[in-house]
């Protein structure tokens, strides 16, 4: 049966929301001088392709490009003019509800859905059945021409009246070599067997088939040199000459190669994988193709990633990218790093209005229908876990556009940013949004008592672990423990050990300090009267902390802040299955700022933060824990039973061999004492191994040998950020219970072991941060040199220095025990330490790749990267979209060592 035409089915004239052509205007030269031209659609470095995607001819790809360009023009024609006064004074909130009728948001969604509709792989069931049935034929084919001829007889395109197009389709419609390589791969055998069972259902219900569509990752052949097999390691850099390919054939498989089906999952781009062998480009199951997102927000909850906001590309593949020669943009000015103007102001990057859910356990992507007070498509919004069911979103800005068309058909687009000051709560069960207004309490002597709208801020949720709810009519008797850091003079020379107290000190609260708490008699919703007194005993509701970010002081003028706010969202009522109804207005409590640069972080935004698990576990070797568990759970009875001969030593000549029998009680006593001695020795050796390596007296950080565990999730760590174009390098830890900051210095080794550890300035902004055991993992971001080149138009220095710049790797690891940067050594010349390093041989050479605008989540040892852009540091202006999901499995062997 002929295959229905999947693409080119959108009739713009018959569109239900067809916009009348814009009135042509004439712009003066002065007005046109504010608009920039020469924008190009960004290309992909990694992307997804469906197993059942068809091999298209160059004419069909040309039709898709023209259609995307027409849709893009219609989308910008629908952008109404805006006034600054109506938005600058107040917050940008969504007034739309599920009951709202035909609104401006509906028009926007309609056009954006047309872009996304090209991302839906609408598979014809009969063609699907034919493809699976003929797979064995494709496997056994040796001649590519025979394969093409057989496919020409099976497939045909409808709704194609162009004779030339018909001729091209008849002669050029075929499977590419990469396509046949995928079909012949043994990796797809199990999937095709699985899919054959789905074909037993009613073929009229094609939605069942769509949900099981497999999308495979691929790397464009232009960057094929990045793919290095673990069996054949190669030392390649991004400076390797890039091969050129002719673009005569625009088949979506022509200039692409799939790493999953070449050398297996161990074949990954080393530019992403500094620690080779720890990253995987994951395949996904989805009805929709995952769009390439940038500056979006992703929050992990119950092993699922919820992705909202950001910008997405309006084209699926490079061959479908629209021509932007008719678009002129007056973009957002003075964008601070890491907001790249070429990405934010690009007309092919449109706001993402959808919510995507990605299951980390099943690798399944869904796009649920959302309702309620839906937030506008926000850029750089921040989200965090509120309860086991709810996610709290705040901040970011909305990009509003207005368009004027001249008599030559040129589109003059004006873009401006409007900050959001409304909080949104997402119910992950019903996918319903609710909004919350954040207000600041009035302070009599406060200078800045206004809770300003912001973006690029630090936002984290802290578990209220001390607020435990007991059984009915039973008071809590457990003692609440909290870790209180000693008040230190802020000289910046602090060890991680200083953040915790001595094991001998009992930092407990008295029993009377915690009031008795009782459970409600019913799990149904409570009255507001009861919930007002039980706001903080509805445990599971986390406290939100917000620090810094950029506020808008004028038209395209932004100022960094360093204020810190604590938000406790009141609960009006609660019900079953962790359902909560929250109040509409929340009062944010400001934490007083200490005017001391050594006790309080400076103004900054886009810093990396996380809630580390370093203090939630004993930092002791696994051998010590195993020995303790054996001692507590097992015992050996050495008492000799009557009638049995005593056992003889295997090697009696060894001095420590057993010579005589001892009673069971004495043996147990000796064994216990030996175990106790062994444990004490292990504890001492543990403290010795966690101390810093031999360092020079000048640069030796203070060492506190005592450790203890703090409360779970009560400490926040953050690093870097920037104030304008000045990138920060310091690391800070915030203790939630004492509400104090501690500055932590970072160190690195040098080529001379006698120098010990020397302090370093790891300047980074726009990166992500997480912890794996006692290792801090920093991923992506911009260095100070990158910021100077992108925003200040500085060039690379002509002098050639050995090594690579500090922080150039995609992954940077810091050991918390020694506060030392791992996997590299500083280069010193004439006693001066330059910001350049050499890598250890066992780690491998890092590739000079820049990665920014993506999100990273760590779940059960797997770090998932979604979206963003990458670029080679030699040609930092050439940005490439990351369309495939990249996963790091941590800790890898190199990271663990």
From Swiss-Prot:
The modification Phosphoserine is found at residue 91. The keyword Phosphoprotein applies. One of its GO terms (biological process) is negative regulation of Ras protein signal transduction. Kelch repeats lie at residues 304-352, 390-438, 543-589, 715-761. It is found in: Cytoplasm. One of its GO terms (molecular function) is GTPase activating protein binding. Present with 1640 molecules/cell in log phase SD medium. This is Guanine nucleotide-binding protein subunit beta 1.
């Amino acid at each position: 049966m002929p295959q229905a035409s999947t693409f080119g089915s959108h009739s713009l004239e018959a569109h239900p929301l067809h916009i009348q052509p814009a009135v042509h205007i004439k712009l003066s030269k002065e007005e046109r001088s504010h608009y920039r031209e020469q924008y190009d659609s960004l290309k992909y470095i990694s992307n997804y392709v469906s197993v059942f995607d068809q091999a298209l001819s160059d004419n069909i790809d040309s039709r898709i490009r023209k259609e995307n360009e027409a849709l893009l023009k219609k989308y910008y024609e629908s952008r109404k003019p805006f006034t600054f006064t109506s938005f600058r004074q107040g917050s940008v909130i969504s007034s739309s509800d599920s009951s709202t009728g035909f609104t401006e948001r509906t028009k926007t969604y309609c056009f954006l859905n047309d872009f996304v509709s090209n991302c839906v792989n609408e598979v014809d069931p009969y063609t699907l059945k034919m493809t699976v049935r003929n797979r064995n034929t494709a496997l056994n084919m040796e001649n590519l021409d025979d394969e093409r001829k057989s496919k020409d007889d099976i497939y045909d395109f409808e709704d194609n009246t162009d004779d030339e197009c018909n001729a091209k389709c008849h002669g050029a419609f075929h499977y590419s070599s990469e396509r046949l390589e995928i079909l012949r791969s043994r990796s797809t055998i199990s999937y095709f067997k699985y899919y054959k069972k789905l074909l037993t259902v009613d073929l009229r219900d094609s939605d069942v088939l769509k949900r099981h569509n497999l999308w495979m990752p691929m790397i464009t052949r232009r960057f094929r040199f990045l793919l290095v097999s673990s069996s054949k390691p190669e030392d390649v850099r991004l400076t390797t000459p890039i091969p050129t390919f002719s673009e005569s054939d625009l088949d979506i498989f022509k200039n692409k190669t799939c790493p999953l089906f070449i050398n297996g999952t161990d074949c990954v781009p080393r530019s992403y994988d500094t620690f080779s062998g720890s990253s995987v480009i994951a395949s996904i199951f989805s009805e929709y193709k995952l769009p390439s997102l940038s500056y979006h927000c992703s929050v992990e909850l119950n092993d699922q990633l919820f992705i909202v906001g950001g910008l997405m590309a309006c084209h699926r593949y490079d061959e479908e990218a629209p021509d932007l020669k008719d678009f002129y943009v007056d973009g957002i000015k003075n964008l601070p790093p890491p907001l790249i103007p070429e990405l934010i102001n690009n007309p092919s990057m449109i706001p993402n209005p959808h919510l995507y859910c990605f299951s980390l356990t099943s690798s399944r992507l869904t796009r649920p229908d959302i309702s309620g007070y839906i937030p506008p498509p926000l850029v750089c919004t921040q989200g965090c876990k509120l309860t086991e069911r709810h996610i709290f979103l705040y901040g970011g800005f909305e990009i509003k556009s207005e368009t004027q068309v001249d008599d030559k058909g040129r589109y003059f687009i004006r873009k401006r940013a409007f900050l959001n000051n409304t909080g949104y709560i997402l119910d992950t069960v019903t996918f319903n949004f609710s909004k919350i207004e954040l207000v600041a309490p009035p302070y009599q002597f406060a200078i800045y008592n206004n809770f300003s709208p912001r973006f690029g801020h630090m936002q984290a949720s802290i578990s209220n672990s001390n607020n435990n709810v007991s059984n009915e009519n039973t008071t809590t008797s457990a003692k609440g423990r909290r870790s209180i850091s000693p008040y230190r003079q802020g000289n910046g020379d602090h060890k991680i050990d200083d953040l915790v107290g001595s094991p001998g000190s009992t930092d407990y609260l008295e029993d009377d300090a915690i009031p008795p708490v009782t459970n409600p008699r019913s799990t149904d919703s409570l009255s507001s009267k009861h919930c007002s007194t039980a706001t903080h005993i509805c445990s599971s509701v986390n406290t939100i902390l917000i620090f810094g970010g950029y506020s808008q002081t004028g038209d395209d003028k932004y100022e960094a802040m360093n204020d810190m706010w604590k938000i406790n969202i009141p609960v009006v009522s609660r019900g079953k299955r962790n359902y909560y109804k929250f109040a509409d207005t929340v009062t944010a409590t400001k934490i007083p700022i200490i005017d001391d640069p050594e006790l309080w972080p400076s103004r900054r935004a886009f810093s990396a933060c996380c809630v580390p698990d370093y203090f939630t576990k004993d930092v002791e070797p696994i051998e010590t824990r195993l020995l303790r568990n054996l001692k507590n759970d097992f015992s050996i009875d050495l008492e000799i039973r009557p009638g049995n001969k005593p056992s003889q030593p295997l090697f009696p000549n060894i001095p420590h061999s057993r010579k005589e029998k001892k009673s069971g009680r004495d043996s147990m006593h000796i064994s216990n004492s030996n175990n106790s001695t062994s444990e004490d020795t292990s504890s001492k050796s543990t403290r010795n191994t966690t101390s810093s390596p031999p360092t020079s007296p000048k640069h030796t950080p203070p060492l506190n040998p005592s450790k203890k565990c703090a409360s779970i999730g009560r400490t926040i760590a953050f690093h870097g950020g920037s104030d304008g174009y000045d990138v920060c390098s310091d690391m800070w830890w915030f203790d939630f219970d004492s509400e104090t900051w501690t500055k932590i210095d970072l160190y690195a080794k040098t080529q001379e072991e006698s120098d010990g550890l020397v302090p370093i300035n790891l300047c980074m902004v726009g990166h992500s941060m997480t912890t794996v055991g006692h290792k801090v993992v920093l991923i992506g971001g911009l260095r100070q040199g990158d910021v100077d080149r992108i925003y200040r138009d500085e060039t690379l220095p002509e002098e050639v220095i050995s090594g690579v710049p500090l922080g150039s790797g995609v992954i940077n690891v810091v050991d918390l025990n020694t506060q030392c940067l791992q996997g590299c050594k500083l280069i010193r010349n004439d006693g001066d330490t330059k910001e350049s390093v050499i890598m250890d041989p066992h780690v491998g050479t890092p590739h000079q790749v820049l990665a920014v605008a993506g999100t990273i989540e760590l779940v059960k040892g797997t770090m998932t990267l979604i979206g963003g852009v990458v670029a080679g540091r030699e040609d930092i202006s050439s940005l490439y979209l990351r369309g495939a999901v990249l996963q790091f499995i941590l800790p890898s062997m190199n990271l663990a060592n």
